[in-house]
Each structure stands twice: as structure tokens, then as C-alpha cells.
Amino acid sequence: MRWYATLALSLLGGFAGAALFSFTPFGGEATRSYLMANPEVLPRAMEVLNQRERQARIDPVRDQLELAFPGAVLGNPEGTLTLVEFTDYACGYCRGSVPDVKKLIAANHDLKVVIKEFPILRPESTDAARMALAAAQQGKYAAFHDAMFELGTPNADTIAAAARTAGLDMARAQKAIDAGTFDPFLRENHELASALGIGGTPGWIVGDQVIDGAVGHERLAEAIAEARES
């Protein structure tokens, strides 16, 4: 129990907090009393520890992470501030986050949103991801991205409809898909997600933060502001 409290104080109050714990008679019953009176300390401490561990994973893969598949970018392709999103077209939470991303782009003209196609929810997710990269190859990624989410669950019909809406050259797209052109990039995205501890969608990286789930515009805007200040 004592080491948990030491960890909590160290994480939440810095090393000074841990030192205070170590050099004052704050053990035994005092520790128990403190934790009983402040039950939120341990979950918060573990949350901070988890975030720090994930932050440490970002730097070794940052260049790879922020490098988009050519054309698979929303917002400003030359932007100096990068938001990375791991997404799956079968993910309702990803669909619900589309307006949040558009709002962020409108408010941050230097924001580059790098989309990492991360198909994990159903086999058709992979088909949609391949078509999305084919759209990127033809300079029509944003149009396909929006159309695919608007059409709902990916299947052969909705994927084809989204591709038509985006104006893809279907013969060219299918040829690239059949050749396996995009599969190495999808595998790389899965490897990146694993390295960062991302197991679901949407997953976000901005600055030194890894954020899980559909957290909403306000939380993402806050993370962008923090990245801008760092």
C-alpha cells in the first residue's frame, strides 16, 4: 500500500511529493487514512503513469507516424501542427467524430490531419480502407472519406457508391487494389497502433498525447492547444 501512495504522490506532486512522503511519518495508518480520504488519487496516478509510458513510445515512431500516405490528409497538407487519427469506416464513433475534425480544421488553418486507415472491426473495413487509399492516390481522399462515412456500414455496395460519389477512376482504383499496392501501408498502420498501445478506433495522437476514443471536439481542441504551446 505504501508504494502505491508513494507512486501517487510522485506522479501527482512530482518528486517533491514523493520526498515529502518518504521523510515524514506518513506510513501505516496514516497512509490508509489518506487513501480512504482521497480515493481518486490512485486511479489518477495510474492514468498519469499510463500516459507517460505512451508518450515515451511516440518519439521513436514520430516521423513514421506523422508521415501520411500520399494524399491521405485532411486540412492543410502543409500544416505545421499535426493531428493523427486511426480510423475504421465501420466505426460509429469515428463517424460521429467527423464533425469534430471538420470544426478543428476550420479553427486551425495550420492543422494537418493525417489519417491512418486502421481496419479492425470487420472484413469490409479493409476493403473500404484500400479504396480510401486508392482515392488518395487519385487526389480524392477527402471526398471518399466523407462519402464513405455518410453511407454507413461498409460493404461492396456502399464502398462502390462512395467511390462513385468521390469521382474515382474505378478501373484504376481496382487495378491498384488487386495488385496489393496498399496492403503494406495498412500493415504498417497496424504496427504503429500496436507500438502506441492503440487497440480501438478512433485513436488520436497530437504532440505527446495519445488519446483513445470519441472524446469530442473540446478535448481534441485542448490537446491541440497544448501541443501548440509545447
Where are these regions (language model features)?
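Extracytoplasmic thiol/disulfide redox context detector
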Residues: R2-P123, D178, P184-G200, E222, ...
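Cysteine-centric redox/oxidoreductase cores and disulfide-bonded domains
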Residues: P119-T201, I205-S230
